[in-house]
């Protein structure tokens, strides 16, 4: 048992000073005033840094020089996790983009192997595709985009303990498939979609509760057709992920989206291999993607994921969007936890929660993380 002291604590509800967080095993034992700490308690002095719940990234294709699609193994997930810790992300959804059924099965096996060893780190796969709309494919390979079929939907449902989320284009897939996934406990997200406003609204009735990278690879909101963006704005209960790197979405649009969506707006990175690594290019599902000036683009200039980290997403949200730090932190912790239904154990600093925490200074440098109660200095 030990206590984290001399820090500003962002609990998810309050901002506390002159308090300590006591950690026992893998859980938070208590949050208490500093004067009530037992004198014999082991103490870690955080030198006035900020302490928040560990960041939760619901869309991570790769980082630290590796891509999940490129090498679909538990080792790749582990490399991603270790790279994440440098930027304060303690839990994430390894994201497999559009690929073959065989690769999807491989990803399920890799996720199962990793999650059996390491709880509360990978929270389940995010299958981004292949059930998308070719019109909004982005970097996804047209060779593998296809409608959902009964066999694979059954396979996905049978492995719902290691699959957290599926992104699909509802206009190209059966509502029964969406309903089946939802019934199995999987979050279904609208994305890479050319749906109209009314098609999107219908899909929310089928059980879709999330939207993948708001504004990107979806029909925009225009005067006579509100599109998918309008449908998301018009449906308060639907969550939306947003990429706050300054390239995918204008910061003013993030500010407007936050005014409308509030606690349903979630920071995601959609990161690729260059996040937390030094590299000029990488291969993304057989395509060469170049990393230049913070941007990841293919030879046609199509964005191929980001090089964003979660701490940078929080910093950009505070400094460029103008959202207060405590709310920006909730967008990276509590709201994603709620979106995938893990907020009973992650996303807040309070008694009984899993001790996944992030320590960062006023300049947004991550100083340390706590994962399952284990304190690790950066």
UniProtKB/Swiss-Prot annotation:
Pfam families: Amidohydro_1 (PF01979). It comes from the Bacteria. Pathway: Amino-sugar metabolism; N-acetylneuraminate degradation; D-fructose 6-phosphate from N-acetylneuraminate: step 4/5. Its cofactor is a divalent metal cation. The active site is at 270 (proton donor/acceptor). A divalent metal cation binds at residues 128, 192, 213. GO terms for molecular function: metal ion binding; N-acetylglucosamine-6-phosphate deacetylase activity. The keyword Metal-binding applies. CDD domains: NagA. Substrate binds at residues 139-140, 216-217, 224, 245-248, 303-305. Keywords: Carbohydrate metabolism, Hydrolase, Metal-binding, Nickel. It catalyses: N-acetyl-D-glucosamine 6-phosphate + H2O = D-glucosamine 6-phosphate + acetate. InterPro entries: Amidohydro-rel (IPR006680), GlcNAc_6-P_deAcase (IPR003764), Metal-dep_hydrolase_composite (IPR011059), Metal_Hydrolase (IPR032466). One of its GO terms (biological process) is protein homotetramerization. It is an enzyme of class 3 (hydrolase). Coiled coil: none annotated. Involved in the first committed step in the biosynthesis of amino-sugar-nucleotides. Catalyzes the hydrolysis of the N-acetyl group of N-acetylglucosamine-6-phosphate (GlcNAc-6-P) to yield glucosamine 6-phosphate and acetate. Homodimer. Belongs to the metallo-dependent hydrolases superfamily. NagA family. This is N-acetylglucosamine-6-phosphate deacetylase.
């Amino acid at each position: 048992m030990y206590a984290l002291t001399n820090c500003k604590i962002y609990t998810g509800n309050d901002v506390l000073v002159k308090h300590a967080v006591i950690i026992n095993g893998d859980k938070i034992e208590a949050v208490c005033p500093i004067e009530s700490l037992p004198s014999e308690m082991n103490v870690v002095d955080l030198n006035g840094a900020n302490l928040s719940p560990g960041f939760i990234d619901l869309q991570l294709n790769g980082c630290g020089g590796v891509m999940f699609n490129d090498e679909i193994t538990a080792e790749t997930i582990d490399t991603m996790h270790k790279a994440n810790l440098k930027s304060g992300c303690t839990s994430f959804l390894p994201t497999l983009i559009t690929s073959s059924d065989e690769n999807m099965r491989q990803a399920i096996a890799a996720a199962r192997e990793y999650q059996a060893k390491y709880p509360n780190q990978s929270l389940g796969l995010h299958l981004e595709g292949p059930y998308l709309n070719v019109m909004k494919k982005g970097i996804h390979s047209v060779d593998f985009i296809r409608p959902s079929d009964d066999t694979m939907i059954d396979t996905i449902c049978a492995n719902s303990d290691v699959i957290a989320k599926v992104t699909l284009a509802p206009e190209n897939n059966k509502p029964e498939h969406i309903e089946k996934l939802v019934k199995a406990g999987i979050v279904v997200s609208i994305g890479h979609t050319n749906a109209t406003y009314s098609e999107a609204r219908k899909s929310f009735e089928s059980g879709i509760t999330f939207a993948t990278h708001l504004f990107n690879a979806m029909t925009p909101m225009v005067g006579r057709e509100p599109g998918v963006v309008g449908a998301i704005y018009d449906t308060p209960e639907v969550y939306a992920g947003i990429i706050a790197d300054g390239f995918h979405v204008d910061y003013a649009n993030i500010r407007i989206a936050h005014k409308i969506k509030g606690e349903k707006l979630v920071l995601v990175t959609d990161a690729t291999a260059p996040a937390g690594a030094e590299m000029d290019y990488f291969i993304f599902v057989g395509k060469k993607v170049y990393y230049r000036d913070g941007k990841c683009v293919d030879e046609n200039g199509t964005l191929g994921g980001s090089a964003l980290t979660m701490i940078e997403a929080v910093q950009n949200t505070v400094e460029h969007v103008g959202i207060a730090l405590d709310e920006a932190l909730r967008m990276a912790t509590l709201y994603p936890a709620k979106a995938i239904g893990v907020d009973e154990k992650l996303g807040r600093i309070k008694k009984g929660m899993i001790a996944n925490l992030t320590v960062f200074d006023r300049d947004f440098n991550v100083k340390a993380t706590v994962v399952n109660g284990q304190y690790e200095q950066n």
